[in-house]
Amino acid sequence: ARSYCTRPNFTLIENGRNTGFSYAVNQGIARAQSKYVVLFNNDAFAEPQWLAELLRTADADPKIFAVQSLMIRHFERELADDAGDYVTWMGFACKTGDGRRVSRYTKQKRIFSACGGAALYRKSILDEIGGFDEHFFAYFEDVDLSWRANNAGYKNVLCPAAKCYHICGASTGAVRYNAFKSQQSGRNSILLPLKNEPLLMLVLNFIPLALGYLLKCYKFHKQGFGEAWDKGMHEAFALLKAGKLGKRPFRLKDLPNYILMELWMIWNMVPYLWYRLVIVKFDLK
């Protein structure tokens, strides 16, 4: 990165410690004076027209908050890595398209959340709803941000013409799971719905959310990462006890948006179960 410092319009921000993704990204966003900000992982590679396609999509509708790239596996370029993220009724945050053929994703569409690994965000809406939550050291911070935008009445969309190639997990060494990722998941899986669902939704969704969390807890313990998971869980409860959840106040005008999110998360159980029970089991592409 230092080799770029002599280039025009380039600013390098160096931190003396590992601050986590959210804190570091917020530093850059705070410096930005443009209409949009773009995030791009250090383990990703963009097509030449990637940025132009993101800008074209965002310019078409002022209600669009985030534009998601079509992220493709770097070493298996016929397969997608991420075509947008979603949250289920049980609180699972998942990728769309992981391991499926890129040819399936050709149309622009609204998505629940944009992956922050390669996405464009409208700066004015960031200023309104706030940046990335720095309590999410890594993982789910982009889902939290997109969910807040949904709750405020804005949209996130997939732009399949904006293609990039991603070496998944290169930054953390976690293509699937490790202790670090397990700890982050244990904490952020609790914070994500508590931050973004109003009280009535949390009451209505208590049983599926509790069941989902117990299933996750069982899975991580079975895979040998129970200690890390439990550590993350205790961190979440410590934040709640300290009153540092950062939950946005309920606004009556946002009620239609909350209802839409509730219905969307219920519906998202369909693609989630289809992927887990059919696509993965039979190795369909």
PLM segments and residue spans:
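Non-catalytic, C-terminal membrane-associated alpha-helical segments of glycosyltransferases
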Residues: 202-285
